Amino acid sequence: MKLFSTVAETLVENQTSLNKADEYNQDHGYHMVDIFQMITGAVKEAPKNDLASGLATASKLLTEKPSGSAEMYSKGLAQAAEYFQGQDLDINSIMPLIQTMLGGGEATVSKGAGGLLDSLVGSLGGEDGLDLGDILSAGASFMQSKQEGDSNLEAAIDAVISSSKMGETPHRAQSSKLVADVLLQTLMSNLGQ
């Protein structure tokens, strides 16, 4: 699927800056490239029109990687695979894909009707449910993004990232923003929007 290979290509281009952002061991960019190359391969090998199968395979492959980011993506992909059982990826399901992938297995998404706000609030709940700290953190992130000129969708993505496991460290927040932006841009351009 072109969607994930485009993310992998973008991560290759940004590998050095992601490594520099990783204050712990300076290898986050390397791991992110590896993670998305594995996801790309697994999704390509999946039966045609079976995104869930590809995501589940990628999740299993990532469990073998000795990386905190791989562990988080593995959990998120497993959750995404469950969500996408019998469902295709389209403009209406991009937010749940981003939420589950970047949620580290803790995103709360449900199938069915609901807008962006429902998706955002659902993703903030995590395993322990939504609390005031989650709302304030997401709201502050949303407001900051809007002040920086981001669209509502970009600001919502920033809010999701800031309140997720991926937002707990600067290097993971940086790579998550890249991943989410590329997923959105690629899907929008593929749909002609």
Protein language model features and the residues they cover:
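Amphipathic alpha-helical interaction segments
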Residues: M1-Q193
